[in-house]
Amino acid sequence: MKKLLLFVVSAIMLVPASVKADEGMWFLMFIERLNHRDMQKMGLQLTAEEIYSINNHSLKDAIVQFNGGCTAEMISKDGLVLTNHHCGYDAIAELSSAEKNYLKNGYWAKNRADELKPSSLYVRFFVRMDDCTKRILSVVNPSMSEADREKAINAEIAKIEKENNEGGKYTVSVRPFFQGNEYYYFVYQDYKDVRLVGTPPESLGKFGGDTDNWEWPRHTADFSMFRIYADANGNPAEYSANNVPLKPKHHLPVNLGGVKENDFAMILGYPGRTNRWMPAGGI
């Protein structure tokens, strides 16, 4: 499964010394039909509508894709974004110089005027998704050559993306799943005025490097903070001194109390891909 998609990756019960996990990846639009009842039995207190809704603000509005490859979270009503240090690494490196080495020394803006704008950075909000399998597969037939099949599918994908981008307001992506047997389109909204708020020194943020990256528990301050700016109406805008912090539809409160035994937990984000359902013959 490709990037750019928003999934519930796993739902788990936190139990000391052992973790019982219902592992896998699921589309948010199928949460109510496939997973919600089991998640409630495990302790989930949110409704399916509070996790994914296209008509009201929901949890999906607080989980964003950061610069095309990472997951990040909205953690304030004023557009503050939390992500990993390694996800913000390129932006931090771009803003650094021999005189102001933010990678080495870290950086914290004392006020919003001190927040720093890298040249190329964006945050992507997930708006909605839908199934377009029947439409895509209706333009192909078994007698087609592979080249003709690909051409027909790509032409239909281009139509779907154009029909749903509302004149360029949204980014639309059609993606194949299950070896091209299912197709879904995803609608996103991109914000490009994203500024660095704070980062720890590289010695903390990248401590352990890729060796520790795959281990748990970790002892790494692997985080960085940014802020999204928008025009006065909350719409995406190019960088301007007149832009204001985005008021997100939803943000996550930070609980300083930590987790307790038997608390419900789940992961919501933008993973890479999975071959979980590949048959034995395909391995």
Question: PLM features: what roles do these ranges have?
Answer:
Residues 4-5, 16-283:
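Terminal presequence/propeptide segments associated with secretion/organelle targeting
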Residues 3-11:
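Sec-dependent N-terminal signal peptides
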